[in-house]
Every structure is written in structure tokens, then in C-alpha cells.
Amino acid sequence: MKFVDEAVIRVEAGDGGSGCVSFRREKYVPDGGPDGGDGGDGGSVYLQADESYNTLIDFQFERFHRAERGKNGRGRDCTGHGGEDLILTVPVGTRAIDEETQESLGDLTKHGQRMLVAKGGFHGLGNTRFKSSTNRAPRQKTLGTPGEVRSLKLELMLLADVGLLGMPNAGKSTFIRSVSRAKPKVADYPFTTLVPNLGVVNPRHGQSFVIADIPGLIEGAADGAGLGVQFLKHLERCRVLLHILDIDPIDGSDPVESARAIVAELEKHSPKLASKPRWLVINKTDLMLEDELKERVENIVKELEWEGDVYTISAYNREGTEALSLKLIDFIEALPPEEEIDKEAEVEFKWDNYHENANESLNENFEDDFDDDDDFDDDDYDVKVIYQR
């Protein structure tokens, strides 16, 4: 299935059902009083994370989603049925952003996690609600309020512990094949990897971590060159980054300059991403003799002024990959528990406080004094609809 990590959709919550104006009609009860019921609340729209999904492609073909409207109230104090909520299933790691305000509604990072993105309209009130000692035959009702409408931008960011960085043909896909059962395409030309790949590494029994491979970066990637820049966001949630460096590039380029270009692109794209723990992994060591290899590695580390961890591997021959995997699992296990993603400012929905405000308004204007046998005159009042802003 095609990998799609962005989609724009429109969600519409259901309108609230309107209240009803009705009076009790029953034999031997000449003055039955009001019995109009309230309407039902409109259905809301939710996003729910499911780990069995890994793409947003479904939302490219179906962009409009609407929840059910609440039913109107009826006589005999019958309350309208509430509209059914609409639940949209998305992959774990999805972020929802309001297109108009650009505010983040939240991230779904756990299987089964649910998030409200459009709140259903509030139900209208029937004329029973307006009965008081001074208004025994109320002909007022309120209409249901409209449901919220939002344009949402959905962004999928893969959840992985380790992310791979490097120039095209540095050997990232070969490395992920050597340490996991993932089978990304490998070939001798640049940009063989076109979409991110995930692999699960099991260095020890009962211990594992997830590794992510993205398309290679080139100079100018932060400004739109190449493919990798659009996938850099998938590394934002990684705990550690592996900078894969080809020790002997086939095109004759300088590995040191390539490494510097990658670091520069990271800093341009996201200083937060550039500040993550980053290990230098020098690949394709099988192409050099041992003496020449040692000298070349020392020169690279010296020129880069690299102060972090440095590892030499041959992903093709699986030399050094197992030891590196063990180092990674030990490092990840030693890290403190991952902090929850920073919560954005609390999102306000249209009708969050409507219920409380409506009740306060009723209490101010009417006394709560009910009598089922209050007298009323059918011709005293006309039906009055109260519109709520």
C-alpha cells in the first residue's frame, strides 16, 4: 500500500436537535400543562489510533466526514435521540492540526487513544423547561446549536527508537536489513529508498527496539532539495540518531564534507532534532585494508572534531552490526522514561460552556415551580422560538 503521511480533511459534528412545544392531551385532564421534550445532542467527531494502520492514504480519497445530527424532541416529555459519534481510525503517531488557526489539537501516540476534534451541537430545550409559577403555559423553545466544523491537517510521524541519517547510498537500507527482518530495496544508485522503512531489532531475548530508515539527505535538503527533507519529521520522536557515513564513496566525494552537510541540514530543519544524541557509524569498512582503515577513521573523526560515539561496521558483511545493536539497546534501556509529548494549550470547543450558560439563563428568568395541572389558555400566547448565539 502506498505510504502517505499527510492529508487534509473536513470534519463536521452533528447539529443538536431542537426542543419541542407540546401540551399534555389526555381524557379527564383538561389542563395538562406543557410536555415538550428536549432535542438530542449532535454527534461528535473523534480520531482514534490503531497500530494496524500505517498510512493516511484512505483520507486522500474520502475528505469529508460528518457525524449524525441529534433528533428533535417530541411530546410526552420525549427527549430526542442523540446523534451517533463518528470515529475516524488513524495510524499511531498521527498529529491533528487545525488548518485555519494552525493550532495543534494533539498527538495520538498509543494504540486505542482517542481525541475529540469536533464537538457536536448542544440540544435545544422543550417548552417544559420554561414552565414556572408565572408562565404556566410556555410556548418557548430553543433550537439545537450547529455542530463544529473544522478543516484538519493530519500528519503521520513514525514512532521509532533509533533513526538513520546519511547521504544517498551510504548503506542505511543495507544496515536495517542486516539487523532486522525489514527488507527495504537495496541497489547501487542514489535514492533507492523512496519512503521511510521500519524494522524491529532483537539484540537479546526479550529486548527490542524499533529503527527507522528515511530517504537519503543531500545538501540543500532543508530548502527542498532531494527527498529526505519531507521525511525528517519521522525522526523527531527517535531517542538516538545513527549518522551512517560511507568511508569510500563510489562518486569520490569527501566523507567529511558529506557529514558536515548532513549536520548543517539538520540544524536548518530543526534545532531540536539536531540536538538529539547522535552516533557516528562509519560503514563499508570491508572496502579497505585494516591499516588504511584505521588511519582513515582517525582522520575523519579528527577533521569532524567528533566528540560522540564512533563505530565502524560493514553492513553488507554484518561485521560490527551485532555489537552496535547491543550498544544501542543498552543505551536506550538506560535512558529515563520518555517524557510525554508537550501538551498544547487546551483546545476550546464551541459549546464547551453552553450547557452551564443555558441553565444559568433559565434559573435567572424562571422559578423552578412546576404544577402538572396549571391552567392555560390556548390563545394567550403564540409559539416563541428562542435563538441562542
Curated annotation (Swiss-Prot):
GO terms for biological process: ribosome biogenesis. Mg(2+) binds at S173, T193. Belongs to the TRAFAC class OBG-HflX-like GTPase superfamily. OBG GTPase family. It comes from the Bacteria. Keywords: Cytoplasm, GTP-binding, Hydrolase, Magnesium, Metal-binding, Nucleotide-binding. GTP binds at residues 166-173, 191-195, 213-216, 283-286, 314-316. Pfam families: GTP1_OBG, MMR_HSR1. This is GTPase Obg. Its cofactor is Mg(2+). It is an enzyme of class 3 (hydrolase). The lineage of its organism: Bacteria, Pseudomonadati, Pseudomonadota, Gammaproteobacteria, Alteromonadales. An essential GTPase which binds GTP, GDP and possibly (p)ppGpp with moderate affinity, with high nucleotide exchange rates and a fairly low GTP hydrolysis rate. Plays a role in control of the cell cycle, stress response, ribosome biogenesis and in those bacteria that undergo differentiation, in morphogenesis control. It comes from Shewanella woodyi (strain ATCC 51908 / MS32). Residues 122-144 are annotated as: Disordered. Residues 160-333 form the OBG-type G domain. Transmembrane segments: none annotated. It is found in: Cytoplasm. One of its GO terms (molecular function) is magnesium ion binding. Residues 1-159 form the Obg domain. Monomer.
